[in-house]
């Protein structure tokens, strides 16, 4: 399928059903368009096109005669307006809080709101259309136009009203209401949640300076089982993953659309950063453990954590742990691996098969295909798939939008919301003091990300055994 952006939108409005939502797996045209429109149709252009379709045009004399002969039937102009409102409603539902970041979206919502409230034609049509309720006072699928508009205007009243919730200045503060709950979940990256007197006017304390990697990780973790560690790790990973918006994934690959403010750190960036931190946290912990026995025990614990992450369907942390264990600075520690029980060496070899990149990571893809519930995907591979599709297919063919490319991109992106559905993970309780220590350790991972430094630490732990003396004695 290909066409100009305007023709694709026109075809969508002609064919879309008012019962279709953007996440419908059987009819994905609406979702594909809303997810990918920024690639070929910037928001400002979509804004103008939607208003044009909503306003329509004055009918000519011949069309008036035809409309008079169709008395009692649905007015096609009213049907088009309903479809425009339905499309925008689904768009706002997809964007969520992101609608606050785009001035073009806010301008469209405000202008459409004004048109809806002043549209006498729709108001008259709504009065002639009945509303049916069931015994639970829920509207049926034949909800009247008036009810749809009432709900739609309710959405419009609330989206722009929250635009000033985010501070734009480093010294700008927004007090939390006394009645507000769950405030920490709404704190974005680049912001801090500080506790200070309600009447206080002073600046909160500055954040603590970042410290180096944890020393004695073996001592810190020896009081916890690998299952407890993996469960807490999984709970925090889900906490971050649930905040990732599917459009963050699109923008990570193709860039942000025109007119979209921000461009700062997203939850996806934090998730990817945590993947690298977890990987080097494992390598650093092993390379900083000087005692051979403790180092082997730490290696065994990390292997069991990786196995537990696989059981929890946390493939992102599973890959991070396995990449850490497969790092060159760790793999060369032959004395450490020799002290590992054969059972755990076998477990590691079985888990290592999932890392096989051959046939486009066929083993991993077959594994996750068998999961019948939500799981944490290996996001770097998902981003690689998107990049391959984006760079391997032209956006325009002969001046027309290659919408088949948009379908392929949307199909991969839709994995994110599908994986986020129906997942409720809570952190296990270990007692207040133990839980607080573990929470800080797993949520503030630190590690050495310089491979040269890690290799040097590894060499100091276990010098090469096959190498002869650096300066062999000369013959006499």
Please report, for each region that a protein language model flagged, where it lies by residue.
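Alpha-helical solenoid scaffolds in large eukaryotic transport, assembly, and signaling factors
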Residues: 1-83, 87-101, 241-244, 249-309, ...
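Hydrophobic residues within the alpha-helices of tandem HEAT/HEAT-like
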Residues: 37-40, 87-93, 131-136, 306, ...
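Short acidic/histidine-centered micro-motifs embedded in hydrophobic/aromatic stretches
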Residues: 49, 53, 108, 321-325, ...
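Alpha-helical scaffold repeats of the Armadillo/HEAT/TPR superfamily
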Residues: 53-54, 102-117, 339-347
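Long amphipathic alpha-helical scaffold regions
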Residues: 58-73, 329-358
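Long, hydrophobic, amphipathic alpha-helical segments used as structural scaffolds
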Residues: 95-99, 103, 120, 313, ...
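Intrinsically disordered, proline- and charge-rich regulatory regions
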Residues: 118-255, 261-273, 289, 293, ...
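Extended alpha-helical coiled-coil scaffold domains characteristic of the BAR superfamily
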Residues: 302-318, 325-332, 358, 372-375, ...
């Amino acid at each position: 399928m290909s066409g100009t952006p305007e023709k694709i939108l026109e075809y969508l409005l002609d064919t879309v059903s008012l019962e279709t939502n953007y996440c419908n797996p059987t009819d994905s045209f609406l979702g594909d368009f809303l997810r990918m429109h920024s690639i070929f149709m910037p928001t400002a252009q979509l804004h103008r096109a939607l208003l044009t379709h909503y306003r329509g045009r004055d009918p000519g004399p011949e069309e008036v005669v035809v409309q008079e002969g169709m008395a009692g039937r649905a007015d096609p102009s009213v049907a088009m307006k309903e479809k425009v409102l339905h499309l925008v409603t689904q768009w706002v539902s997809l964007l969520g809080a992101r609608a606050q970041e785009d001035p073009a979206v806010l301008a469209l919502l405000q202008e459409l709101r004004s048109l809806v409230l002043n549209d006498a034609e729709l108001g008259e049509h709504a009065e002639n259309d009945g509303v049916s309720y069931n015994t639970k006072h829920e509207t049926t699928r034949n909800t009247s136009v008036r009810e749809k508009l009432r709900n739609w205007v309710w959405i419009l009243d609330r989206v722009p009203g929250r635009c000033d919730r985010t501070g734009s200045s480093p010294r700008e503060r927004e007090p939390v209401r006394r009645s507000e709950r769950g405030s920490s979940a709404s704190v974005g990256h680049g912001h801090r949640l500080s506790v200070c007197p309600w009447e206080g006017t002073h600046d909160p304390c500055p954040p603590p300076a970042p410290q180096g990697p944890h020393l004695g990780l073996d001592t810190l973790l020896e009081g916890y089982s690998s299952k407890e560690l993996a469960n807490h790790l999984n709970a925090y990973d889900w906490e971050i993953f649930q905040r990732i918006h599917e459009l963050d994934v699109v923008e990570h690959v193709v860039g942000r659309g025109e007119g979209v403010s921000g461009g700062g750190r997203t939850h996806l960036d934090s998730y990817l950063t945590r993947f690298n931190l977890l990987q080097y946290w494992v390598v650093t912990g092993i390379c900083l453990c000087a005692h051979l026995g403790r180092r082997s025990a730490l290696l065994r614990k990390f292997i069991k954590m990786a196995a537990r992450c696989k059981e929890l369907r946390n493939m992102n942390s599973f890959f991070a742990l396995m990449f850490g264990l497969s790092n060159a600075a760790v793999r060369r520690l032959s004395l450490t691996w020799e002290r590992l029980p054969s059972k755990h060496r076998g477990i590691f070899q079985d888990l290592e098969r999932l890392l096989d990149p051959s046939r486009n990571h066929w083993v991993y893809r077959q594994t996750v295909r068998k999961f019948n519930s939500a799981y944490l995907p290996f996001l770097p591979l998902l981003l690689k798939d998107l990049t391959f599709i984006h760079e391997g297919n032209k956006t325009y063919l002969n001046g027309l939008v290659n919408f088949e490319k948009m379908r392929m991109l949307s199909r991969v992106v839709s994995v994110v919301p599908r994986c986020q559905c129906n997942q409720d993970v809570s952190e296990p309780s270990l007692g207040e003091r133990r839980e607080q220590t573990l929470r800080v350790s797993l949520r503030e991972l630190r590690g050495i990300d310089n491979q040269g430094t890690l290799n040097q630490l590894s060499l100091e732990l276990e010098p090469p055994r096959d190498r002869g003396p650096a300066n062999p004695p000369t013959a006499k």
